[in-house]
């Protein structure tokens, strides 16, 4: 129960410490996790207001070139990662939004915009709405 989520990705186990996530949330901070679909769905089940963003390349060939261009993985590992990416892509509909990582700066800006929009959802601002509504009624 020390991990809020964990999953096996290409033969390695990864997890997110619960204490870190909860500490950040208590401080009112946004928590950004770079996790695969198993973990993302676990997060959404535990935190229904979580925003799930699927970051994807502009096309399959770009993904393959990026993985190969790193020169850090064996051909077998690259093949395993491409197969995993295919399986993950089958679950995109479980996410709230996609971000196309074609231009890094643009992708980061879009990420920030989506997060900012979440802060202004009506359901997240009921106290503010109630306060202003009450003030207006005093006129």
Residue ranges and their predicted role:
Residues 72, 90-139:
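NTP-dependent small-molecule kinase module
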Residues 23-26, 44-48, 90-92:
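Conserved catalytic network of the ASCE P-loop NTPase/AAA+ motor domain
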Residues 50, 60-62, 68-90, 105-106:
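Ras-like small GTPase catalytic G-domain
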Residues 1, 44-47, 66-67, 96, ...:
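Short, flexible helix/strand-to-coil boundary loops that buttress conserved ligand/catalytic motifs
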Residues 1-31, 37-41:
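ATP-dependent small-molecule kinase phosphotransfer cores
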Residues 31-36, 45-69, 100-101:
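Conserved phosphate-donor/acceptor-positioning beta-strand/loop module used by diverse small-molecule
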Residues 1-4, 66-73, 114-117:
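Conserved AAA+ ATPase "sensor/coupling" helix adjacent to the nucleotide-binding pocket
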């Amino acid at each position: 129960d020390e991990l809020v989520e964990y999953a096996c990705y290409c033969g390695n186990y990864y997890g997110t410490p619960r204490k870190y996530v909860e500490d950040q949330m208590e401080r009112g901070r946004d928590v950004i996790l770079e996790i695969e679909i198993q973990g993302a769905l676990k997060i959404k089940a535990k935190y229904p207001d979580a925003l799930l963003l699927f970051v994807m390349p502009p096309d399959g060939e770009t993904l393959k070139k990026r993985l190969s261009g790193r020169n850090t993985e064996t051909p077998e590992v690259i093949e395993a990662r491409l197969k995993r990416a295919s399986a993950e892509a089958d679950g995109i509909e479980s996410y709230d939004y996609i971000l196309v990582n074609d231009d890094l700066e643009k992708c980061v800006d879009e990420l920030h915009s989506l997060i900012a929009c979440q802060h202004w959802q009506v359901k997240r601002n009921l106290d503010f709405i109630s306060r202003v509504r009450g003030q207006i009624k005093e006129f």
